[in-house]
Protein backbone atom coordinates (compact mmCIF):
# COMPACT_ATOMS: atom_id res chain seq x y z
CA UNK A 1 0.00 0.00 0.00
CA UNK A 2 1.42 3.36 -1.02
CA UNK A 3 1.97 6.03 1.61
CA UNK A 4 3.06 9.56 0.64
CA UNK A 5 5.64 9.41 3.45
CA UNK A 6 7.54 6.96 1.22
CA UNK A 7 8.39 9.96 -0.99
CA UNK A 8 10.35 11.72 1.79
CA UNK A 9 13.84 10.83 0.53
CA UNK A 10 13.42 9.04 -2.77
CA UNK A 11 16.73 7.82 -4.19
CA UNK A 12 17.09 7.26 -7.94
CA UNK A 13 20.10 5.73 -9.66
CA UNK A 14 21.52 3.24 -12.11
CA UNK A 15 25.07 2.09 -12.81
CA UNK A 16 25.68 5.21 -14.91
CA UNK A 17 25.38 7.41 -11.80
CA UNK A 18 27.90 5.58 -9.62
CA UNK A 19 31.48 6.84 -9.11
CA UNK A 20 34.15 4.52 -10.53
CA UNK A 21 35.52 3.64 -7.10
CA UNK A 22 32.16 2.28 -5.86
CA UNK A 23 29.52 -0.25 -6.90
CA UNK A 24 25.80 0.43 -7.19
CA UNK A 25 25.15 -2.20 -4.50
CA UNK A 26 27.52 -0.43 -2.11
CA UNK A 27 25.97 3.01 -2.69
CA UNK A 28 22.41 1.71 -2.38
CA UNK A 29 23.23 -0.22 0.80
CA UNK A 30 24.72 2.92 2.39
CA UNK A 31 21.65 4.92 1.36
CA UNK A 32 19.28 2.27 2.74
CA UNK A 33 21.17 2.10 6.02
CA UNK A 34 20.94 5.89 6.26
CA UNK A 35 17.16 5.79 5.87
CA UNK A 36 16.03 6.46 2.28
CA UNK A 37 12.30 5.84 1.99
CA UNK A 38 12.00 4.73 -1.66
CA UNK A 39 14.36 3.60 -4.42
CA UNK A 40 14.00 3.83 -8.19
CA UNK A 41 16.18 1.75 -10.49
CA UNK A 42 16.88 3.97 -13.50
CA UNK A 43 19.34 2.34 -15.88
CA UNK A 44 19.82 4.75 -18.80
CA UNK A 45 22.46 5.98 -21.21
CA UNK A 46 24.95 4.62 -23.75
CA UNK A 47 26.71 2.30 -21.28
CA UNK A 48 23.59 1.10 -19.49
CA UNK A 49 23.13 -2.59 -18.78
CA UNK A 50 20.62 -4.40 -20.96
CA UNK A 51 18.81 -7.72 -21.14
CA UNK A 52 19.68 -10.41 -18.62
CA UNK A 53 22.45 -8.37 -16.95
CA UNK A 54 20.02 -5.55 -16.26
CA UNK A 55 17.42 -7.99 -14.96
CA UNK A 56 19.85 -9.79 -12.64
CA UNK A 57 21.09 -6.50 -11.19
CA UNK A 58 17.51 -5.29 -10.69
CA UNK A 59 16.65 -8.49 -8.81
CA UNK A 60 19.69 -8.09 -6.59
CA UNK A 61 18.83 -4.46 -5.83
CA UNK A 62 15.20 -5.31 -5.11
CA UNK A 63 16.30 -7.97 -2.63
CA UNK A 64 18.61 -5.44 -0.98
CA UNK A 65 15.80 -2.87 -0.72
CA UNK A 66 13.39 -5.41 0.74
CA UNK A 67 15.91 -6.38 3.40
CA UNK A 68 15.49 -2.79 4.65
CA UNK A 69 11.69 -2.79 4.04
CA UNK A 70 12.02 -0.14 1.33
CA UNK A 71 10.01 -0.44 -1.91
CA UNK A 72 11.81 -0.51 -5.26
CA UNK A 73 10.38 1.20 -8.34
CA UNK A 74 11.55 0.60 -11.91
CA UNK A 75 11.92 3.57 -14.24
CA UNK A 76 10.15 3.37 -17.57
CA UNK A 77 10.70 -0.37 -18.24
CA UNK A 78 7.28 -1.99 -17.81
CA UNK A 79 8.49 -5.42 -18.92
CA UNK A 80 11.36 -5.43 -16.42
CA UNK A 81 9.09 -4.24 -13.61
CA UNK A 82 6.77 -7.17 -14.31
CA UNK A 83 9.56 -9.74 -14.68
CA UNK A 84 11.15 -8.92 -11.34
CA UNK A 85 7.82 -8.19 -9.60
CA UNK A 86 8.96 -4.68 -8.68
CA UNK A 87 6.97 -2.65 -6.18
CA UNK A 88 6.03 -0.15 -8.86
CA UNK A 89 6.81 1.73 -12.04
CA UNK A 90 7.62 5.35 -12.84
CA UNK A 91 6.98 6.75 -16.31
CA UNK A 92 7.51 10.07 -18.06
CA UNK A 93 5.21 12.06 -20.29
CA UNK A 94 6.73 10.52 -23.42
CA UNK A 95 6.70 6.94 -22.16
CA UNK A 96 3.95 4.35 -22.42
CA UNK A 97 0.41 5.48 -21.56
CA UNK A 98 -0.41 4.49 -17.99
CA UNK A 99 -3.83 3.16 -19.00
CA UNK A 100 -2.06 0.57 -21.17
CA UNK A 101 -0.40 -1.15 -18.22
CA UNK A 102 -2.21 0.01 -15.06
CA UNK A 103 -4.26 -3.19 -14.84
CA UNK A 104 -1.01 -5.17 -14.58
CA UNK A 105 0.16 -3.03 -11.66
CA UNK A 106 -2.77 -3.31 -9.28
CA UNK A 107 -1.62 -2.83 -5.68
CA UNK A 108 1.69 -1.48 -7.00
CA UNK A 109 3.04 2.08 -6.94
CA UNK A 110 2.63 4.09 -10.16
CA UNK A 111 4.47 7.39 -10.55
CA UNK A 112 4.28 9.95 -13.36
CA UNK A 113 6.59 12.84 -14.26
CA UNK A 114 4.86 16.21 -14.58
CA UNK A 115 6.93 19.21 -15.62
CA UNK A 116 4.37 22.01 -15.74
CA UNK A 117 0.68 22.92 -15.57
CA UNK A 118 0.08 21.98 -19.21
CA UNK A 119 1.45 18.47 -18.64
CA UNK A 120 -0.69 18.17 -15.51
CA UNK A 121 -3.81 19.18 -17.45
CA UNK A 122 -3.02 16.58 -20.13
CA UNK A 123 -2.42 13.80 -17.59
CA UNK A 124 -4.95 11.29 -16.32
CA UNK A 125 -4.02 10.77 -12.67
CA UNK A 126 -6.81 8.31 -11.89
CA UNK A 127 -4.37 5.36 -11.79
CA UNK A 128 -1.37 7.35 -10.51
CA UNK A 129 -0.14 7.28 -6.89
CA UNK A 130 2.24 10.24 -7.05
CA UNK A 131 3.69 12.76 -9.48
CA UNK A 132 7.35 13.72 -9.81
CA UNK A 133 7.58 17.45 -10.46
CA UNK A 134 10.61 19.17 -11.93
CA UNK A 135 13.31 19.78 -12.69
CA UNK A 136 13.45 22.11 -9.69
CA UNK A 137 16.92 23.32 -10.56
CA UNK A 138 19.57 22.75 -13.22
CA UNK A 139 20.68 19.13 -13.15
CA UNK A 140 23.60 17.25 -14.64
CA UNK A 141 22.18 13.78 -13.88
CA UNK A 142 19.84 13.70 -16.87
CA UNK A 143 21.09 14.53 -20.36
CA UNK A 144 17.56 15.17 -21.59
CA UNK A 145 16.44 17.31 -18.64
CA UNK A 146 14.19 20.22 -19.53
CA UNK A 147 14.46 23.81 -18.31
CA UNK A 148 14.08 24.18 -14.53
CA UNK A 149 10.57 25.07 -13.37
CA UNK A 150 11.58 26.03 -9.83
CA UNK A 151 9.99 25.14 -6.48
CA UNK A 152 7.04 27.49 -7.14
CA UNK A 153 5.68 24.92 -9.60
CA UNK A 154 4.77 22.77 -6.59
CA UNK A 155 2.50 25.40 -5.04
CA UNK A 156 1.01 26.16 -8.49
CA UNK A 157 0.05 22.50 -8.87
CA UNK A 158 -1.28 22.41 -5.31
CA UNK A 159 -4.01 24.86 -6.40
CA UNK A 160 -5.40 22.04 -8.55
CA UNK A 161 -4.41 18.94 -6.57
CA UNK A 162 -4.48 19.87 -2.91
CA UNK A 163 -3.56 16.58 -1.27
CA UNK A 164 -2.15 14.59 -4.19
CA UNK A 165 1.35 13.24 -3.39
CA UNK A 166 4.08 15.34 -5.03
CA UNK A 167 7.79 14.58 -5.03
CA UNK A 168 10.23 17.21 -6.28
CA UNK A 169 13.08 16.25 -8.59
CA UNK A 170 16.03 17.84 -10.36
CA UNK A 171 19.22 19.42 -9.07
CA UNK A 172 18.25 19.13 -5.41
CA UNK A 173 21.00 19.24 -2.80
CA UNK A 174 21.55 20.19 0.82
CA UNK A 175 21.79 23.90 0.00
CA UNK A 176 18.50 24.28 -1.88
CA UNK A 177 16.02 21.86 -0.32
CA UNK A 178 14.31 24.40 2.00
CA UNK A 179 12.29 26.24 -0.72
CA UNK A 180 10.94 22.88 -1.91
CA UNK A 181 9.70 22.08 1.59
CA UNK A 182 8.20 25.57 1.91
CA UNK A 183 6.25 25.13 -1.34
CA UNK A 184 4.60 21.95 -0.07
CA UNK A 185 6.35 18.92 -1.57
CA UNK A 186 5.84 15.57 0.15
CA UNK A 187 9.45 14.64 -0.52
CA UNK A 188 12.48 14.93 -2.76
CA UNK A 189 13.96 12.68 -5.43
CA UNK A 190 17.73 12.82 -5.67
CA UNK A 191 20.46 11.18 -7.72
CA UNK A 192 23.83 12.90 -7.49
CA UNK A 193 23.17 14.40 -4.04
CA UNK A 194 23.58 10.83 -2.76
CA UNK A 195 25.79 9.12 -5.38
CA UNK A 196 28.40 11.89 -5.19
CA UNK A 197 28.15 12.47 -1.47
CA UNK A 198 31.31 11.98 0.56
CA UNK A 199 29.11 11.00 3.51
CA UNK A 200 25.89 9.33 2.36
CA UNK A 201 24.66 8.73 5.91
CA UNK A 202 24.97 12.41 6.79
CA UNK A 203 23.37 13.55 3.52
CA UNK A 204 20.33 11.28 3.79
CA UNK A 205 19.75 12.10 7.45
CA UNK A 206 19.99 15.82 6.63
CA UNK A 207 17.23 15.47 4.03
CA UNK A 208 15.08 13.29 6.31
CA UNK A 209 14.93 16.06 8.92
CA UNK A 210 12.77 18.12 6.56
CA UNK A 211 10.11 15.44 6.12
CA UNK A 212 9.84 13.67 9.47
Curated annotation (Swiss-Prot):
Binding site for 2-[(2R,5Z)-2-carboxy-4-methylthiazol-5(2H)-ylidene]ethyl phosphate: 139-141, 171, 191-192
Required cofactor(s): Mg(2+)
Enzyme class: transferase
Note on how the cofactor is bound: Binds 1 Mg(2+) ion per subunit.
Gene Ontology biological process terms in this record: thiamine biosynthetic process; thiamine diphosphate biosynthetic process
Keyword Metal-binding: yes
Catalytic activity, EC: 2.5.1.3
Positions bound to Mg(2+): 76, 95
Known pathway: Cofactor biosynthesis; thiamine diphosphate biosynthesis; thiamine phosphate from 4-amino-2-methyl-5-diphosphomethylpyrimidine and 4-methyl-5-(2-phosphoethyl)-thiazole: step 1/1
Keywords: Magnesium, Metal-binding, Thiamine biosynthesis, Transferase
MF terms in GO: magnesium ion binding; thiamine-phosphate diphosphorylase activity
Kinase in keyword set: no
GO cellular component: cytoplasm
A Pfam family per the record: TMP-TENI
Catalytic activity: 2-[(2R,5Z)-2-carboxy-4-methylthiazol-5(2H)-ylidene]ethyl phosphate + 4-amino-2-methyl-5-(diphosphooxymethyl)pyrimidine + 2 H(+) = thiamine phosphate + CO2 + diphosphate; 2-(2-carboxy-4-methylthiazol-5-yl)ethyl phosphate + 4-amino-2-methyl-5-(diphosphooxymethyl)pyrimidine + 2 H(+) = thiamine phosphate + CO2 + diphosphate; 4-methyl-5-(2-phosphooxyethyl)-thiazole + 4-amino-2-methyl-5-(diphosphooxymethyl)pyrimidine + H(+) = thiamine phosphate + diphosphate
Purpose of the protein: Condenses 4-methyl-5-(beta-hydroxyethyl)thiazole monophosphate (THZ-P) and 2-methyl-4-amino-5-hydroxymethyl pyrimidine pyrophosphate (HMP-PP) to form thiamine monophosphate (TMP).
Stored HAMAP family: TMP_synthase
Recorded family membership: Belongs to the thiamine-phosphate synthase family.
Protein's name according to its UniProt entry: Thiamine-phosphate synthase
Classification of source organism: Bacteria, Bacillati, Bacillota, Bacilli, Bacillales
Amino acid sequence: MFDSKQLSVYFICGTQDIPKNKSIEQVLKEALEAGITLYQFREKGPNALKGEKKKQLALKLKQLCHSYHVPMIVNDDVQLAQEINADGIHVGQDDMEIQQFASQFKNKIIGLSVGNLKEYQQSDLSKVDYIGVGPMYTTSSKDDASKPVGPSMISQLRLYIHDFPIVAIGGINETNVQPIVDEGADGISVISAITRSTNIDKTVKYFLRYFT
